[in-house]
Amino acid sequence: MHGLILAGGEGSRLAAGGIAVPKPLVEVAGRPQIVGLLETFTTLGCSSLTCAVRADFPAVRRLLDGRRFGPPLTVVTCRTPSSLHTLAEGLQGIAAGPVFCSMVDTVMRPEDWEAVYGAAGRYLEEGAELVLAVTPYVDDESPVYVSRHGRDVRAVSDEPLTPVCVTGGVYGLSAAARGAAVDAVARGVHKMRAFLKALVAEGRRVAAVEVPRIIDIDRPSDLQTANAWLAARER
């Protein structure tokens, strides 16, 4: 699978909380978050790496230009209004094939990255069009809830569903899902959650793989929580 990291957001809540560096450069487990994700994707086995990075953050581009990873790395600069738009922008330059995609603010344990990557590859090979990483751990101010039957996603909702299960910002995309994302933006769909809802409503095969905990780094407190969580595991 090709690897894609979406880093097109402004990171306004981090900045408002006093974090001076762009979100992709915040330190998680002792290294810039975007570097950690690229190293993780390399370890997982991605055949290529693409980062869609906000054009307002030249420091991120400079950092990546000075780094070398195993697979070839392409940096796409963008100024997009939503993560769905950033996804569509990033997909445009990726060769044919399935894509393993993460938001830049997603934090998981190494073993959970391996579980999600492995399941995404299997489920896509077995006919799923889109695979979502999900978790019962809710730390988002506006979570996207998922209802499942086995591995299959039956509903995507803004309202809580039982048992509690929310998306975590990590996706496996087939060729069909790649095309659907680009088409959705062309049709005026504005948010990632609206895209996910539409795929399920259309009867597309959307699968989920659950892990115990996923942290989204939106606020300074999230950054502290993520670093404390990962540090505790290493003791």
Q: Could you tell me what each predicted segment is?
A:
Residues 2, 47-49, 72, 98, ...:
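Residues at the starts of beta-strands that form the adenosine-phosphate
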Residues 114, 124, 152-235:
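Catalytic-core segments of class I nucleotidyltransferases/pyrophosphorylases
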Residues 56-58:
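A conserved acidic beta->alpha catalytic loop
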Residues 20-35:
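Short catalytic helix/loop segments, enriched in acidic residues and glycine
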Residues 31-48:
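A short, N-terminal amphipathic alpha-helix
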Residues 50-54, 132-134:
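Short internal beta-strands
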Residues 1-19:
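N-terminal nucleotide-binding beta1-loop-alpha1 segment
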Residues 60-61, 68-145:
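Conserved beta-loop-beta/alpha segment of the NTase-like Rossmann-fold superfamily
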